Regions:
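Intrinsically disordered, low-complexity proline/glycine-rich segments
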Residues: 2-205
Length: 205
């Protein structure tokens, strides 16, 4: 359990914070959890607190080439708008917050084991471990903002985020939803590549 919890730090709502997160960063100020239902991000995602209360909701437009997504809070107020654009081999997501702040996330430096995304417009950095499905979000002064973890082998695409700078919660939620889409896009590309390789091998035989 200790070894697994070091690399796979996801936890369910109501469970204690991951021991390794606590050891490295202290107790989180707040934790949020996501569930995407019906096997598709386009059906919407609920972001809840430890008690299961829905605090935010994200919904994507059907058949949108730019994967347009809007996030609202529990009262229906607009929180953020996210759009994806593809430049050559790299995806870039543009996020506009309700307060007018604007920033970008790119998968340009994503690799198999260690991923780094510079968040242009904020000066923040998202550092990740794809193998362990964990990501750490740091501010411009290299202080921890949040730790994001994905549940392994979940049909409902579950994430947990431990927040250490609660004043940045809405921005963290926007980054969380964007990351969720980026991970889904990566899975889709890998699946397509595998299918193409299998098809090519069968044809050659």
């Amino acid at each position: 359990m200790g070894v697994m919890s070091k690399y796979m730090r996801f936890r369910e709502a109501g469970e204690a914070a991951n021991v390794n997160n606590v050891a490295e960063y202290g107790e989180p100020a707040r934790s949020l959890f996501t569930t995407s239902k019906f096997f598709s991000l386009h059906k919407g995602t609920d972001i809840t607190d430890d008690a299961g209360n829905v605090l935010y909701h994200s919904a994507s437009k059907f058949f949108s080439i730019h994967d347009k997504t809007d996030i609202t809070d529990q009262d229906g107020n607009h929180v953020a708008h996210i759009e994806r654009k593809v430049f050559t081999l790299h995806e870039r997501h543009f996020i506009t917050m309700a307060d007018g702040r604007y920033f970008e996330l790119s998968n340009e430096l994503w690799h198999l084991i260690k991923d780094i995304s510079n968040i242009e417009g904020l000066g923040w950095v998202l550092r990740g471990n794809i193998a362990g499905l964990n990501f750490q979000l740091y501010d411009q002064d290299d202080r921890i903002i949040a730790v994001i973890s994905q549940k392994l082998f979940s049909i409902h695409d579950k994430y947990c985020v431990d927040i250490y700078q609660p004043e940045e919660e809405k921005t963290v939620v926007a980054i969380l939803v964007t990351l969720q889409h980026m991970m889904k896009d990566r899975e889709a590309r890998n699946s397509s590549s595998s299918s193409f390789s299998s098809s090519s091998s069968s044809s050659s035989n």
